[in-house]
Amino acid sequence: MYKLCKTEQSAQRQRELERGLLAAMSSHQYEEISVSDLCEHMDIPRKSFYRYFSSKDGALHALIDHTLLDFEAFPAIRKNGEKRSNQTDLERFFRFWESQKPLLDALERSGISGILVTRSIDHALSDVGTPSRFLLQREKEARKQAITFGVCGLMSMVLSWHHDGYLLPAAQMAELAVQLLTKPLFSGSEFY
Protein backbone atom coordinates (compact mmCIF):
# COMPACT_ATOMS: atom_id res chain seq x y z
CA MET A 1 0.00 0.00 0.00
CA TYR A 2 0.92 3.64 -0.16
CA LYS A 3 0.32 6.80 1.82
CA LEU A 4 -2.37 9.24 0.79
CA CYS A 5 -0.45 12.50 1.00
CA LYS A 6 -2.02 15.52 2.66
CA THR A 7 0.34 18.24 1.46
CA GLU A 8 1.48 19.23 -2.01
CA GLN A 9 5.12 18.86 -0.98
CA SER A 10 4.54 15.33 0.30
CA ALA A 11 2.62 14.39 -2.87
CA GLN A 12 5.43 15.74 -5.04
CA ARG A 13 8.01 13.73 -3.12
CA GLN A 14 5.91 10.59 -3.46
CA ARG A 15 5.59 11.11 -7.22
CA GLU A 16 9.36 11.66 -7.42
CA LEU A 17 9.90 8.25 -5.80
CA GLU A 18 7.40 6.69 -8.23
CA ARG A 19 9.31 8.21 -11.16
CA GLY A 20 12.50 6.73 -9.66
CA LEU A 21 10.90 3.29 -9.74
CA LEU A 22 9.80 3.83 -13.34
CA ALA A 23 13.34 4.93 -14.29
CA ALA A 24 14.75 1.79 -12.68
CA MET A 25 12.18 -0.32 -14.54
CA SER A 26 13.33 1.19 -17.84
CA SER A 27 16.56 -0.79 -17.59
CA HIS A 28 15.76 -3.61 -15.14
CA GLN A 29 12.92 -6.03 -14.68
CA TYR A 30 10.66 -5.20 -11.76
CA GLU A 31 11.54 -8.39 -9.88
CA GLU A 32 15.26 -7.52 -10.05
CA ILE A 33 14.79 -4.15 -8.34
CA SER A 34 15.04 -4.03 -4.56
CA VAL A 35 14.01 -1.19 -2.29
CA SER A 36 17.66 -0.89 -1.24
CA ASP A 37 18.80 -0.57 -4.87
CA LEU A 38 16.11 2.00 -5.58
CA CYS A 39 17.03 4.07 -2.52
CA GLU A 40 20.73 3.88 -3.36
CA HIS A 41 20.07 4.95 -6.96
CA MET A 42 17.94 7.89 -5.76
CA ASP A 43 20.38 8.71 -2.96
CA ILE A 44 17.73 8.58 -0.23
CA PRO A 45 17.54 6.62 3.02
CA ARG A 46 15.25 3.57 3.12
CA LYS A 47 13.28 5.35 5.85
CA SER A 48 12.25 7.99 3.29
CA PHE A 49 10.92 5.31 0.96
CA TYR A 50 8.94 3.63 3.72
CA ARG A 51 7.46 6.96 4.76
CA TYR A 52 5.41 6.77 1.54
CA PHE A 53 5.16 3.08 0.66
CA SER A 54 4.82 -0.14 2.62
CA SER A 55 6.72 -2.06 -0.06
CA LYS A 56 8.01 -1.97 -3.62
CA ASP A 57 4.57 -3.22 -4.73
CA GLY A 58 3.02 -0.25 -2.95
CA ALA A 59 5.22 2.08 -4.99
CA LEU A 60 4.20 0.31 -8.21
CA HIS A 61 0.51 0.54 -7.30
CA ALA A 62 0.91 4.25 -6.50
CA LEU A 63 2.66 4.83 -9.83
CA ILE A 64 -0.18 3.15 -11.72
CA ASP A 65 -2.97 4.73 -9.67
CA HIS A 66 -1.52 8.22 -10.02
CA THR A 67 -1.14 7.66 -13.77
CA LEU A 68 -4.83 6.72 -13.93
CA LEU A 69 -5.68 9.92 -12.05
CA ASP A 70 -3.56 11.92 -14.53
CA PHE A 71 -6.03 10.96 -17.27
CA GLU A 72 -8.64 13.33 -15.83
CA ALA A 73 -6.38 16.32 -16.58
CA PHE A 74 -5.32 15.07 -20.03
CA PRO A 75 -6.63 17.54 -22.63
CA ALA A 76 -9.26 16.67 -25.19
CA ILE A 77 -8.74 17.88 -28.73
CA ARG A 78 -11.90 18.93 -30.51
CA LYS A 79 -11.94 20.54 -33.92
CA ASN A 80 -14.06 23.64 -34.64
CA GLY A 81 -16.29 23.40 -31.59
CA GLU A 82 -16.86 19.68 -32.12
CA LYS A 83 -19.12 18.28 -29.42
CA ARG A 84 -18.04 15.60 -27.02
CA SER A 85 -18.81 12.08 -28.27
CA ASN A 86 -17.74 8.48 -27.77
CA GLN A 87 -15.28 9.02 -30.62
CA THR A 88 -13.65 12.10 -29.06
CA ASP A 89 -13.61 10.56 -25.57
CA LEU A 90 -11.99 7.36 -26.82
CA GLU A 91 -9.48 9.23 -28.98
CA ARG A 92 -8.45 11.15 -25.86
CA PHE A 93 -8.18 7.82 -24.00
CA PHE A 94 -5.89 6.30 -26.63
CA ARG A 95 -3.78 9.47 -26.95
CA PHE A 96 -3.32 9.45 -23.18
CA TRP A 97 -2.05 5.87 -23.16
CA GLU A 98 0.16 6.57 -26.15
CA SER A 99 1.76 9.32 -24.03
CA GLN A 100 2.39 6.75 -21.28
CA LYS A 101 4.72 4.63 -23.42
CA PRO A 102 7.54 4.54 -20.81
CA LEU A 103 5.19 3.03 -18.23
CA LEU A 104 3.73 0.55 -20.73
CA ASP A 105 7.26 -0.40 -21.86
CA ALA A 106 8.36 -1.00 -18.26
CA LEU A 107 5.31 -3.09 -17.39
CA GLU A 108 5.61 -5.16 -20.56
CA ARG A 109 9.36 -5.68 -20.08
CA SER A 110 8.68 -7.08 -16.61
CA GLY A 111 5.66 -9.14 -17.68
CA ILE A 112 3.35 -7.34 -15.26
CA SER A 113 0.96 -5.49 -17.59
CA GLY A 114 -1.90 -7.38 -15.95
CA ILE A 115 -1.42 -5.25 -12.83
CA LEU A 116 -2.31 -2.19 -14.93
CA VAL A 117 -5.55 -3.86 -16.05
CA THR A 118 -6.46 -4.87 -12.50
CA ARG A 119 -5.70 -1.41 -11.07
CA SER A 120 -7.65 0.18 -13.97
CA ILE A 121 -10.73 -1.89 -13.11
CA ASP A 122 -10.39 -1.05 -9.42
CA HIS A 123 -10.04 2.64 -10.30
CA ALA A 124 -13.08 2.57 -12.59
CA LEU A 125 -15.18 0.89 -9.89
CA SER A 126 -14.08 3.36 -7.20
CA ASP A 127 -15.86 6.59 -6.48
CA VAL A 128 -12.90 8.44 -7.99
CA GLY A 129 -13.25 6.96 -11.47
CA THR A 130 -15.61 8.51 -14.00
CA PRO A 131 -16.96 5.09 -15.08
CA SER A 132 -18.31 4.56 -11.55
CA ARG A 133 -21.13 6.90 -12.58
CA PHE A 134 -21.94 4.66 -15.55
CA LEU A 135 -25.36 2.93 -15.56
CA LEU A 136 -26.42 4.47 -12.26
CA GLN A 137 -29.96 3.18 -12.74
CA ARG A 138 -28.69 -0.43 -12.68
CA GLU A 139 -27.91 -2.48 -9.60
CA LYS A 140 -24.34 -2.41 -8.32
CA GLU A 141 -23.39 -5.92 -9.53
CA ALA A 142 -24.66 -5.24 -13.07
CA ARG A 143 -22.64 -1.99 -13.19
CA LYS A 144 -19.58 -3.82 -11.90
CA GLN A 145 -19.82 -6.44 -14.65
CA ALA A 146 -20.39 -3.85 -17.40
CA ILE A 147 -17.51 -1.68 -16.21
CA THR A 148 -15.19 -4.69 -15.90
CA PHE A 149 -16.08 -5.75 -19.46
CA GLY A 150 -15.49 -2.27 -20.86
CA VAL A 151 -12.25 -1.54 -18.99
CA CYS A 152 -10.75 -4.96 -19.73
CA GLY A 153 -11.55 -4.60 -23.41
CA LEU A 154 -10.16 -1.08 -23.71
CA MET A 155 -7.02 -1.82 -21.70
CA SER A 156 -6.45 -5.00 -23.75
CA MET A 157 -6.65 -2.87 -26.89
CA VAL A 158 -4.16 -0.40 -25.39
CA LEU A 159 -1.70 -3.14 -24.43
CA SER A 160 -1.94 -4.84 -27.83
CA TRP A 161 -1.63 -1.50 -29.64
CA HIS A 162 1.45 -0.65 -27.55
CA HIS A 163 2.99 -4.10 -28.05
CA ASP A 164 2.57 -3.79 -31.83
CA GLY A 165 4.25 -0.37 -31.87
CA TYR A 166 1.22 1.93 -32.25
CA LEU A 167 0.72 0.99 -35.90
CA LEU A 168 -2.67 2.71 -36.04
CA PRO A 169 -3.28 6.34 -35.07
CA ALA A 170 -5.23 7.05 -31.88
CA ALA A 171 -8.22 8.31 -33.91
CA GLN A 172 -8.47 4.99 -35.75
CA MET A 173 -8.17 3.03 -32.48
CA ALA A 174 -11.03 5.15 -31.11
CA GLU A 175 -13.10 4.46 -34.21
CA LEU A 176 -12.56 0.70 -33.78
CA ALA A 177 -13.52 0.87 -30.11
CA VAL A 178 -16.69 2.83 -30.92
CA GLN A 179 -17.65 0.19 -33.47
CA LEU A 180 -17.09 -2.56 -30.92
CA LEU A 181 -19.27 -0.73 -28.42
CA THR A 182 -22.09 0.19 -30.80
CA LYS A 183 -22.35 -2.62 -33.37
CA PRO A 184 -23.50 -6.22 -32.83
CA LEU A 185 -20.55 -8.43 -31.91
CA PHE A 186 -21.93 -11.48 -33.66
CA SER A 187 -23.62 -11.61 -37.03
CA GLY A 188 -25.43 -14.37 -38.85
CA SER A 189 -27.65 -17.10 -37.54
CA GLU A 190 -24.76 -19.55 -37.05
CA PHE A 191 -24.22 -18.04 -33.59
CA TYR A 192 -27.82 -18.51 -32.42
Where is each model-derived feature located?
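Residues in the recognition helix of alpha-helical DNA-binding motifs
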Residues: 20, 52, 62
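Short hydrophobic/aromatic patch on the recognition helix
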Residues: 43-53
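Amphipathic alpha-helical packing segments from all-alpha helical-bundle domains
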Residues: 111-137, 141-156, 186
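C-terminal peripheral helix-coil segments that are non-catalytic and often amphipathic
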Residues: 160-192
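Basic, helix-initiating cap at the start of DNA-binding domains
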Residues: 1-27, 32, 37, 41
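Helical hydrophobic small-molecule/effector-binding pocket
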Residues: 83-130
